């Protein structure tokens, strides 16, 4: 750990000189990039400097104890050493946390895709419950939500819904929601009172910039058609809905939420870029995830991550074994405690890797 900290400190000093160089400032794009890199290192370097200063103070005090000093002063020095040693432990933990690699996507906006799984109409209603849960959670953070694509059922459920969440740090907290969500409850249509199990799949994708993923326009097929509502009835007299197919990967994205064909195409392209980026990232990180079987999981769409049990009023996250008996408020967006638990477990796993 110390070797890495020394490397970061040296790099920070080099960058301090570079960003003060007038010739480097002439290239604004490069200068801003270096300034960001410098700023990202500042906290860890400041903490490391304090860590070294505290260690030095301990050594200085120990040297003082070797001298012939009065008992009262000796007691004070020994008390100082105790406090400083406690501070060293605190700083070591802080440094370990700061050394945990940050996900470069953490500050980005996200696309959330919810699809009804096994369970027919009941699964579609559960998908609608999850959509409401995430929009309510977004409201608690003052994040904005915006529908991209909606396939609604006649009874108010969703076969599929894709929506965007805009806000600082949205991906850092919502990324843990990818996977299969399972619900156990008695459907309104069930006369015998038998509990049914249904599922919905959630995919959370970071919004990507053009520089993150390149798409060859020749690899795309764009189809336009008239937007439809419940039961397929036409709700628009123009071909405003857009379907984009990425031929090499077979990915298909549709968007009909906007009245303008151009806006629907822009939204669909954003979703397509995020899906392609997610596909590439999943392939890249597959070997890492295999080497270190994380409790929090890999974000695999097929991984059953959580159960919502209505009769018992509980929600259980199977990745960390956490059960909360507050299902009603949880589905109203009160999911912070669960997400904090997932973050804590992931951070502790990463800290083990550093140690």
UniProtKB/Swiss-Prot annotation:
Keywords on record: Cytoplasm, Methylation, Protein biosynthesis
Post-translational modification: Methylated by PrmC. Methylation increases the termination efficiency of RF1.
GO molecular function, one term: translation release factor activity, codon specific
Compartments, record wording: Cytoplasm
GO cellular component: cytoplasm
Keyword Oxidoreductase listed: no
Keyword Secreted: no
List of residues that carry N5-methylglutamine: 233
Similarity-based family: Belongs to the prokaryotic/mitochondrial release factor family.
Primary role: Peptide chain release factor 1 directs the termination of translation in response to the peptide chain termination codons UAG and UAA.
Record protein name field: Peptide chain release factor 1
Organism this protein belongs to: Clostridium tetani (strain Massachusetts / E88)
Taxonomic classification: Bacteria, Bacillati, Bacillota, Clostridia, Eubacteriales
Record gene name: prfA
């Amino acid at each position: 750990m110390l070797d890495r900290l020394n490397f970061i400190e040296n790099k920070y000093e080099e960058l301090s000189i570079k960003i003060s160089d007038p010739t480097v400032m002439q290239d604004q794009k490069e200068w801003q990039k270096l300034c960001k890199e410098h700023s990202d290192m500042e906290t860890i370097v400041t903490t490391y400097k304090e860590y070294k200063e505290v260690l030095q103070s301990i050594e200085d005090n120990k040297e003082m104890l070797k001298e012939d000093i009065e008992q009262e002063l000796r007691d004070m020095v020994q008390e100082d050493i105790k406090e400083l040693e406690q501070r060293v432990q605190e700083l070591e933990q802080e440094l370990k946390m700061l050394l945990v690699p940050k996900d470069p996507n953490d500050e980005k906006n996200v696309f959330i895709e919810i699809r009804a799984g096994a369970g027919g109409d009941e699964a579609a209603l559960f998908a609608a419950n999850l959509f409401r849960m995430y929009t309510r959670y977004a409201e608690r953070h003052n994040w904005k939500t915006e529908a991209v694509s909606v396939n609604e059922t006649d009874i108010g459920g969703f076969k599929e819904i894709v929506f965007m969440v805009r806000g600082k740090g949205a991906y850092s907290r919502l990324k843990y929601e990818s996977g299969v969500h399972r619900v156990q409850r008695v459907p309104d249509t069930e006369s015998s009172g038998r509990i049914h199990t249904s599922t919905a799949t959630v995919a959370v994708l970071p919004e990507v910039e053009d520089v993150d993923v390149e798409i060859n326009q020749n690899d795309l097929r764009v189809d336009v058609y008239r937007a439809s509502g419940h039961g397929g009835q036409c709700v628009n007299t123009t071909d405003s809905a857009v379907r984009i197919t990425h031929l090499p990967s077979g990915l298909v994205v549709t968007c009909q939420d906007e009245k303008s064909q151009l806006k629907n195409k822009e939204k669909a392209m954003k979703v397509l870029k995020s899906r392609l980026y997610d596909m590439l990232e999943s392939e890249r990180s597959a070997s890492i995830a295999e080497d270190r079987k994380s409790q929090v999981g890999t974000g695999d769409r097929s991984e059953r991550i959580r159960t919502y049990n209505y009769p018992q009023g509980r929600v259980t996250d199977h990745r960390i074994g956490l059960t909360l008996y507050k299902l009603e408020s949880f589905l109203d967006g009160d999911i912070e405690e669960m997400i904090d638990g997932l973050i804590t477990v992931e951070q502790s796993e990463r800290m083990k890797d550093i140690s």
